[in-house]
Structures are given as structure tokens and as C-alpha cells.
Amino acid sequence: MASVATNGAAVESNDRKRPFEGARNYRFKKQKKEKDQKDSVLKTEGTHEEVLLKDVEALLKKHFISETLAQANGKENGTSKTDPSTSLPAPFTEIELTVQEISSTGDGLALAPDSKQVYVVPFTAPGDKVKAKVVRHFAKQNYSITDFISVITPGPLRDNSLINCRYFSACSGCQFQMLPYEQQLAHKKTIVEKAYKNFSDLAPELVPPVADTIGSPLQYGYRTKLTPHFDGPPGQKRSDGRKGIKRKFEEVPPIGFMKKGTRHTIDIEDCPIGTDAVRMGMKSERKRVAAELDKYAKGATILLRESTKRLPKDPQPQPREDAILEDRGEHFHEKTCVTDQKGRTTEYIDDFKFENPAGAFFQNNNSILPTFTQYIRDHILPPTSSGDAPQKIKHLIDAYSGSGLFTITLSQLFPKSLGIDISSSSIEFASTNAALNNLAPDHASFIAADAANLFASIEFAADETVVVIDPPRKGCDDLFLRQLLRYSPARVVYVSCNVHTQARDVGVLVNGMEGVDGGFGPGSGVYEIESLVGFDFFPQTGHVEGVAVLQRRREAAEVEVGKEV
């Protein structure tokens, strides 16, 4: 069969740049990191490399078991094979591979014939026979990085008619455009499952079945923030010692996103996962940069952030050239693109209104947020069908509260809600958002607290309180988990953009921490997992948002009551 084209994406030459992997003080940083990990109960960081290595090891183990059985059968029949060759192809060699599975990092994993080396091939699906170019071997870890060149024979899951971007298979932004959406959701369920298997340190019986991934209403046109960039003029770095040479742009540089596995920027004029307003802003900003190129002495990142203005139906608003007008039934939404980091954006989640600095963090897929926040509302309180007397949970604590998404959208369930963040600017905007949504300070309030004393000023009774945590990708640290276990609220809802660090942290909450709750053994901590599910905030990519609901164990609750008595 003829090779399937790579959607116009050129194959990079052999002399291309690769991400810098070293540093002058790398050895010292590594030693400090190893010491910190030794002193911490958190023994993993859930990095891309750690996740990939777990999948590589699992594939090799599965392959080795199958191979051992085959060899045993061969010996019985007198047809035992000789040992396979252990030599590896030289870098930049083109090879043919058949993809076995997709890793939790979003890349395909393949085993070459007669090889115990796993090849990582981006933009591929199980069953694909592909041509790939070897980039680098990690012999000790038994895997190799490759570049995708083309599909020779597509596997049963691949459907190239679904691809909606000419830069797919080159741009690093999307990994799954060739997969039907139901297959993307199924794969993301396995990401959550493997995260808890590989990183939680929990016995299988302590981890409930992961629910089916909840999909996004929009699979394209959903992303409300994009940050394309361009590099500085060629030769911008100092080339004559201390003096340096100031370079000017001689032509408009590529403006877009990184080519997969490199530091090269691809010139991308449009991104189909962006909302219409963001895509409109991308086109206008590309024109502006080209017209004002003499103002730039170095590269820059361009902010594209959607903002929404809610307009009444009467009088009907007039369309604007720089805005997208959407009919939302009872009102119109006028969507514009904000490009000033210091500007403000407005977003609506159902009827909740949020204002934020354009450059600040806020969820980037508004189409799924109503479903997402409703799920949290439905699961934040104990289930009423448990047979036990319902716990009277009166208080919400929103740790890592940011601009108040959970504090505000969950406020109707609690007499008092408190958002906590270490950023004073986030707290300022959260307080503003509470006022915008007519929440009195005695109903929903916010405080900026130092990480070392996050719960020090909390007066809510622990058995009447639920805590929502939504940390950054690195997850919680030792100190926060220690404080949370000492406080021991009745329930914890853990939201995470990195299910691997979430699994690690949830494992600590379930197994406990020595010297804090008397735990530190299989399931001997304060909490048990009630439910696990993934949300697809970023269709066409390998990312999944995880939600874990934890309930304080009955024995722990009885100990807490005993303390109060």
C-alpha cells in the first residue's frame, strides 16, 4: 500500500536543533533534587519521562512474557529461536515499525522485530505500520525517540479523514486528530487507570473503578487561550564576547508553535482548536507583528485570550468586525480577543460571571465548564443513599482557589465558603468575582495565606468541612499534605491537570503520613477513595483532567469525635 502523506508537514533534516538537555550546574541540581526526594514522602514527580518509562517497562514485560512462552513452546517442538540481535540502528536511520499501543504521554509505542527496544513514535495509533526516523537511543531505559515520517499501512483505529489541521504530525500541540473521539475518551480513561496503578502506591483493592471519561461538548474551536510565539533574529545571541551584536529582523519570522521534539517554531497562520474569537485574534496579531517588526529586537510570545460580553436581545446588537456574536437564547454573547497581558477578560460559566487578568490562569475550555462544575456540585457532599445518617457539612474550603472558580460556583451548597491562595493578586480578583456574583463576604470570602500556614486560621470544624484542591501540574507538596491530614476535613475533592501527581498525592492521603495521622501503610491513612473520573478539557491532545473524591474513613471520623469529647 502507498504511504499515507504527513499532511504537508515537512520532515526535518538531520542537523536540526534538539531541546537542550544539560546545564552547567546540572549535577548539583540533580544531587539537591535527589536529597529533597529522599527526605520527602513524595518519591515521584509524575514527569513526562517517568510516565513514559512506566509504559515502556509494562510493554517490555508483556512482550517478554509472550516471547518466553513462545520460546518454551519452540523448545518443546525442537524449533527454538536464536537470541535476537541487540544492535540498534544509528541515529537518523529510517526504519519501519508497527505500533503496539499509545502511551500515557500521547505517543505511540512500537517494538522492532527481534528487538527488546521500545520505539516512541508520535502521531500514531495502535496497529499503524509506519516509517520513522531514529533520533536518540536511551539504551539503559530500553527505549528510543523517533520522528514520525509517514504511515505505510493504517491501523484499525486511524481515520485520517478526521484530521482538521494541515500542521498535524508536525506541530506539537495535538496528538490525536486521527482518532475517533470515542477512542480518545477511552484512551484517557486508561491514562487515569495507569496513573493510579503506577504512581499511587495503593493496593488495587483500595482504588475504585475509574468512570468513563466525560467528553467535551466541543472537540474543535474550544480553546479560549493560545500563546503563539516567534524567535529572535538569526544570530541574535552574542557572537563576539562581551560586546554582543544587536540583530534586526530582515524578514517576518515564523509565528506559531513548536515543531514536535525540537526548538524550531513552525509558522502557523490558524489553529482549529482555538475559539473563533481567538482564531480571529491570531490572524490580526500576525498582521500587526509583521507591520511593527522594527519594534522588536528579540522574540516574543503573543497572548490571545477570549473575552465575553453578555448583551440583551432588545435592542439587538450590531455585528462588529473585531468580534464574534453568538445567539445564546435569552441573550447574545459578544466574543472578542484580548492581547494585552494587563487587560481584563470576562467569562460566564452558566450564570456565574468571572473577571480575570488576561494573562492569569483560568480554565481554557469554557464549553465543558458547566458540565464540570455541575459534576463537582453533585459529588462534593456525601451520597444520600449510603444508609448512614447524612453528615452535616456546612463549610467549603477552596485551596489553590485562584480567582474563585470553585468557591463561587459551589457557594449555593454551603452557608460559608472560604477560598485560600498564596497569591494576593488572585485573592483580590476572587473577591471581586464574588461581589460580581452577589455573594456577601460572610457567605464567600477569600484570604491570602502563606503555604507553611495554609490552614492555621481556619475555624471551621473539620467534620463539617469539605476541601477542594486544584494544584498546579507538580501537585501538592509534603508540607501541604501534612497540613491537610492534620486538619482532616470530612471530604476532599482533588482536581488535577496531572493525574500522575494526583495519584501520588491521593496515595499519601489514603496510606497516611507517619507522624501525622498514625498511618503510613496500605490503606491505614485517614481517607478512602469514593470515585475517580477524567474530564476531557483538551480534545485532540493527550491531556486529561482528573477528579478524585475522597471520604474520611469511618474509623478516622470516630477518632476525631473522640478527640472532641
Regions found by a protein language model. Name each.
Residues 112-114, 259, 349:
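Structural motif
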Residues 91, 101-104, 126, 218-222, ...:
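A short catalytic or substrate-binding loop motif that flags glycine-/basic-rich loops and adjacent residues
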Residues 102-107, 249-253, 338-343:
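A short, compositionally biased
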Residues 152-153, 159, 163, 169-290:
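Extended interfacial segments that mediate partner engagement and assembly in macromolecular machines
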Residues 131-133, 227, 303:
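Hydrophobic beta-strand signal
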Residues 2-162, 167:
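Terminal RNA-binding accessory module
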Residues 3-16, 22-26, 37-70, 274, ...:
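Rossmann-like S-adenosyl-L-methionine
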Residues 150, 230, 259, 304-306, ...:
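Flexible glycine-/small-residue-rich
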